[in-house]
Amino acid sequence: METQDHTLYVLLGPTGVGKTDLSLDIAERLGSPIISADSRQIFRELPIGTAAPTPEQRARVPHLFVGTHSVRDYYSAGMYEVEVLEALKELFRKYRGVLLTGGSMMYIDAVCRGIDDIPDPFPEVREELYARYAAEGLDGILAQLRLLDPDYYAKVDRRNYKRVIHGLEICLSTGRPFSSFHRHEAKERPFRIVKIGLYREREELCKRIDARVLEMMEQGLEEEARAVYPLRHLNALNTVGYKEMFEYFDGSIDRAEAVRRIQRNSRVYARKQMTWFRRDSTIRWFHPEADKGTVLTLVT
């Protein structure tokens, strides 16, 4: 593969912005499959709650890395990096341009910049931390993480106990801050990368997100969540749309409140996505409808 001869187009943006429709048009223009960069669409049990491409959309354009794993499977951004790069080797033998699309920031960075190899934690450290969490909750673990790795503490979702524990177990096992393993220099890639960002005004995006959640409920999100409810302890299910439904199934909130929380948490997630993406000066930003023609000219 020669850098100047092959291009990876990356279509990114917050949840609900309209990536799916435009991605189909771009992929048809390129004549190549779509690579999904969604860390939850990869799980076959979650098509509704992750807004995975429909069978009709997949018949129109083949999609890779959608529904390929079970929620029971361990999967990471590092594994995704390796597998996508292998897939691109094959795809670039047939196509000059390939589209990667999604909103999972770590997955996009994994392909475009690369991820450091992070050592496995000592099993006894992990066991001790999970025992502490079960006995005392997360406050003490958070305090220790803040002391040992203030950078990671500042950006981690402190309600996500698995991510908090993972950060601390790496600190304790290696004697280094977890954040020190995060790559600052991008790996070289043997292809061009063109990043296309989609945006909408905040009010417009929030309305679209709220409407999409209601549409998901009509499509059967509640039933989909019930089917995986016995597996709620899995990290793949610690995600917006499912954890709120699980609270409803537990009886701690009613159905209407669960829907409201999914809408609210989806809006919060969209804001976090935009904060992350805005750090990347290589992204060119477009409105998915008003600038559609301009975007399509970029891939010709």
Curated annotation (Swiss-Prot):
Annotated GO biological process: tRNA modification
Q: What does this protein do?
A: Catalyzes the transfer of a dimethylallyl group onto the adenine at position 37 in tRNAs that read codons beginning with uridine, leading to the formation of N6-(dimethylallyl)adenosine (i(6)A).
Gene that encodes the chain: miaA2
Quaternary structure and partners:
Monomer.
Could you tell me the superkingdom of the organism this chain comes from? Bacteria
Q: Which residues bind ATP?
A: G13, P14, T15, G16, V17, G18, K19, T20
Q: Mind telling me which NCBIfam families this protein's record contains?
A: miaA (TIGR00174)
Q: Which positions does UniProt annotate for substrate binding?
A: T15, G16, V17, G18, K19, T20
Catalysed reaction(s)? Answer: adenosine(37) in tRNA + dimethylallyl diphosphate = N(6)-dimethylallyladenosine(37) in tRNA + diphosphate
In its UniProt record, a GO molecular function of this protein is:
ATP binding
Q: EC number(s) for this protein?
A: 2.5.1.75
- UniProt family annotation: Belongs to the IPP transferase family.
Keyword Nucleotide-binding present in the record's keywords: the answer is yes
The UniProt entry, under PANTHER family, shows: TRNA DIMETHYLALLYLTRANSFERASE
Annotated stretches, region: Interaction with substrate tRNA: 38-41
What keywords does the record list, in alphabetical order? ATP-binding, Magnesium, Nucleotide-binding, Transferase, tRNA processing
Question: What is the protein name for this chain?
Answer: tRNA dimethylallyltransferase 2
Where is the site labelled Interaction with substrate tRNA? Answer: S104, R126
Is the Magnesium keyword given for this protein? yes
Cofactor entry: Mg(2+)
The record's listing under InterPro entries reads: Dimethylallyltransferase, IPT, P-loop_NTPase
Native source species: Porphyromonas gingivalis (strain ATCC 33277 / DSM 20709 / CIP 103683 / JCM 12257 / NCTC 11834 / 2561)
At the highest ranks, the source species' classification is: Bacteria, Pseudomonadati, Bacteroidota, Bacteroidia, Bacteroidales
